[in-house]
Design a protein with these regions (language model features):
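Non-heme di-metal
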Residues: 1-248
Length: 248
């Protein structure tokens, strides 16, 4: 068995190529100069994803075993509150950008029905609410990726109000990823658990990359990075990739 802390850090390092590949795709979307309607749709998708994150974390709280450390429950509740605040912040950002109220009753059900572009779907697919290892990996991989993505948006949006809001979200997501790493280092204390975590992490990364491709511009160079590092069996959909030179 590996030392749990070292094992978790190895999983974290194995995420970095994935994170970088997806950052390239998100930056390409913003650098392609999308019109305000495309930005609005993109922000709505991200807003609803935050609400979905809130729902999944609260399920973990409700379904936590009776012997769960109160500190762990407090940490999950802090994350849930952050997700609720992100939901509100992105709604405010959309209304600020469009200068009109957002009808949640109209947009939320449509986005919740979308199965192809939400990172929060990973939580549903891998039974995070009932699987402590899956939940820790979700925090570390999905929330870790989210921190990078929100930071890319904060760095590329020229409006200071939007940039500040998204930088705050990025910082919160970094904290959530840290919670996942701490949690996993405590519970991955057998060879069997570590093997399971390693296999599950690979599945989560694959799902997350394909969701990212569906929700952004699938970039040729990002796909090449993924296939070079993780293998060419990663791409589960036939995305028509775009070379970076077409964006820049």
């Amino acid at each position: 068995m590996r030392d749990p802390v070292e094992f978790v850090e190895e999983i974290w390092e194995d995420n970095q190529v994935l994170f970088k590949a997806m950052q390239i795709q998100i930056k390409a979307f913003y650098d392609s100069k999308p019109n305000i309607e495309k930005l609005r749709r993109n922000f709505i998708r991200r807003m609803v994803n935050e609400r979905m994150n809130l729902n999944e974390i609260m399920k973990s709280v409700v379904n936590s075993p009776d012997d769960t450390d109160p500190i762990e429950i407090m940490s999950l509740c802090k994350q849930a509150l952050d997700e609720a605040n992100h939901y509100r912040m992105v709604k405010d950002a959309i209304e600020y950008m469009t200068n009109e109220p957002l009808d949640l009753a109209e947009v939320v059900p449509t986005e919740l029905a979308d199965l192809t572009t939400k990172g929060a779907r990973v939580a549903e697919r891998f039974n995070v609410e009932h699987d402590p290892i899956a939940r820790g990996l979700y925090q570390m991989i999905v929330e870790g990726n989210a921190s990078c993505n929100w930071q890319v948006m904060a760095d590329n949006l020229t409006d200071p109000v939007l940039s500040f809001s998204y930088a705050k979200i990025a910082a919160d997501e970094r904290f959530h990823a840290k919670l996942g790493r701490i949690h996993l280092a405590k519970i991955l204390d057998t060879e069997e658990k570590q093997q399971y975590a390693s296999e599950l992490a690979t599945k989560m990364r694959k799902d997350l990359f394909n969701l990212n491709c569906a929700g952004n511009i699938p970039i040729k160079e990002s796909r090449e990075m993924i296939e070079s590092y993780y293998g060419d069996d990663w791409i589960t959909a036939d995305f028509n990739t775009v070379p970076l030179k077409k964006i820049y």
